[in-house]
């Protein structure tokens, strides 16, 4: 059986995993987990590098209101819904 690789974009730990167990540990119970399986390491790495989001906290001010976003996706969704 061919080895499979897993990319976790959102989870407890982001990265490329070479087994389902480690991937599952990163995503199990994580709200909004984002992961995908690949048949080869090269494809998995390209996907991960093409979807790198800045990490850390983002602060955005919209029309006199403020809100902290803990991930870039939430930030982008708020901006695209407002404008």
Q: What kind of feature is each model-predicted range?
A:
Residues 1-83:
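Protein-protein interaction regions
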